[in-house]
Amino acid sequence: MADLSKYRNIGIFAHVDAGKTTTTERILKLTGQIHKTGEVHDGESTTDFMEQEAERGITIQSAAVSCFWNDHRFNVIDTPGHVDFTVEVYRSLKVLDGGVGVFCGSGGVEPQSETNWRYANDSKVARIIMVNKLDRLGADFYRVCKQVKDVLGANPLIMTLPIGTEDEFVGVVDLLSEKAYIWDDTGLPENYEVTDIPADMVEQAAEYRVKLIETALEVDEDMLMEFLEGEMVPTIEQIKACIRTGTRDMTFFPTYGASAFKNKGIQLILDAVVDYLPSPTDVNPQPLTDEEGTPNGEFAIVSADETFKALAFKITDDRFGTLTFVRIYSGTLKKGDTILNAATGKTERVGRMCEMQADDRNELTSAQAGDIIAIVGMKSNVQTGHTLCDPKHPIVLEAMVFPKPVISISVTPKDKGSTEKMGLAIGKMVAEDPTFKVETDIDSGETILSGMGELHLDIKVDILKRTYGVELEVGKPQVAYRETITTAIEDSYTHKKQSGGSGQFGKIDYRIKPGEPGSGFVFSSVVVGGNVPKEFFPAIEKGFKGMMDTGVLAGFPVLDVEIELYDGGFHAVDSSAVAFELAARGAFRQSIPKAGAQLIEPIMKVDVFTPDDHVGDVIGDLNRRRGMIGGQEAGVSGVRIKADVPLSEMFGYIGTLRTMTSGRGQFSMEFSHYMPCPNNVAEIVIAEVKAAKIAKDAARK
């Protein structure tokens, strides 16, 4: 079995265009996995292998690649930087042990890098930092380090200093070894020399080296005191051991300067992955849960000697067939083994499995704890987040949680052939992407696609058209409005029906009130005595909960309602579970209007970058879109504006922004929260929904 201490499962995270994919290309070149580096701007990068990725120059899927450096195995996942594809970041973080946060030397801490950093903190993933593109105009290593501290609240542990700035950036000073690494102008990563620190940087390097040592030794108080009192000078290995501890505890983040495009500084980052990021055995083991998702106090111990436990974290369908990407946490898996899908209860035999090199693969006969592999052609309806395990020792790993879609479009196939193709294609696409939802409008028969943003759905439609050959008519984007209540009330409802023989009877007395934001539906009972027998409580809860899907204002789902059953009545003969379920449904229809039904809309956290001379125009436009400006931050080449803006006001924003800023503005947005719609907006939305329903009804007659 392979030595798990020499495994590094890492992700590369950053904002769009900070250089994640280019960095991955350089890693693959240096580790011998590819012999010619492909460039993102040429559409030739190894990990951006989808047609849509190559065209748009962005990473959409998390591509997994394996390589070796200094006798250590790296499983590297290159993740998207665009906010519409954060599902890929979510699921990557679930299966990784460490990461490299890439920041643009001129752009600094940009919106999506901030979001990804927050996700990684939540997942407790240790990271090192790479300040990339130091050859760019306006690049400033020290300013980015300050932003990491001020904006992210993180402690960058500076490990290298850049030699030269912008187009004169030639290499770095390694503070630990007190040596300079200088590359020539050939652009080849192997063409560098290790030399003495340039004379004009000796004093600065000495100052930063002391800071590095003091910060590193803070994880070992005794050693720090001895160092500060002049009683000892720690060896490089002692310093590295402290850095390793502090990195894995996320006390600080080793920080390096580089230019991936110019092939400068990457080797030191690879060394840092080996030296400081955790192996699979260094991180906390994955918790196990019961079937309801509640932790049971047990864990998936990372060891090849344990029973097989793995998580399916990604499903793709490509020219090889269906690939199920799996992180093995415990045990071993051999070709021909039978495994259990804990979610479906089905077992199946593993026919083929492989190690992925972006869109190429190496066939495997076995894999072990710590490995990230792909199983080919699984048939047990495996979906993202499903647990795979030994049939004799069934377990459930902690589930993956994904954000809900906030935008929808309707699509209609143009002919019968496209209808059949679309049905097959959508089934595969839903399995691949948990934030992509599909449903059919009962009234119109239209297919409704829902996702995380305009680009997300644009890519999905493009895949349907070009990958699967589906001819489509696409409707306008629709906002995921919701309904809620604003007032607490007490009410009573009686369901009574008599039509010969036994009838139906159920009476419920209840309190209904607004719930906490994000609480969804909460039901409780404080009934004392036997006025409503306990056996009917589940039916009452089911009745209320079933009505949450369709609000009374415009038929949108209802959010954040608490209902407390406190009394009622029943009939010995006529009461039944069905009668009480119907009573709850009637009660919901009766009480929601009384409780101040209100339309609410999704609010997006919008981050806009604009050149200085267009700030006024951009802020004015955001205000016209009902935006609430949250702050401004001046940068080297422009201003970053933060605002909360209703999603309904953001359609087509990128075109407006480019026009206002002569093509130089950029923005990103992600869902933040729901807020009440202004009355004038609510009236328009409700009227449009009702008009559409009348039109559909008329079309059916």
From Swiss-Prot:
Catalyzes the GTP-dependent ribosomal translocation step during translation elongation. During this step, the ribosome changes from the pre-translocational (PRE) to the post-translocational (POST) state as the newly formed A-site-bound peptidyl-tRNA and P-site-bound deacylated tRNA move to the P and E sites, respectively. Catalyzes the coordinated movement of the two tRNA molecules, the mRNA and conformational changes in the ribosome. GO terms for cellular component: cytoplasm. GTP binds at residues 14-21, 78-82, 132-135. Residues 5-281 form the tr-type G domain. The lineage of its organism: Bacteria, Pseudomonadati, Pseudomonadota, Gammaproteobacteria, Alteromonadales. Pfam families: EFG_C (PF00679), EFG_III (PF14492), EFG_IV (PF03764), GTP_EFTU (PF00009), GTP_EFTU_D2 (PF03144). Keywords: Cytoplasm, Elongation factor, GTP-binding, Nucleotide-binding, Protein biosynthesis. GO terms for molecular function: GTP binding; GTPase activity; guanosine tetraphosphate binding; translation elongation factor activity. The gene is fusA1. This is Elongation factor G 1. PANTHER family: ELONGATION FACTOR G 1 (PTHR43261:SF5), TRANSLATION ELONGATION FACTOR G-RELATED (PTHR43261). It comes from Colwellia psychrerythraea (strain 34H / ATCC BAA-681).
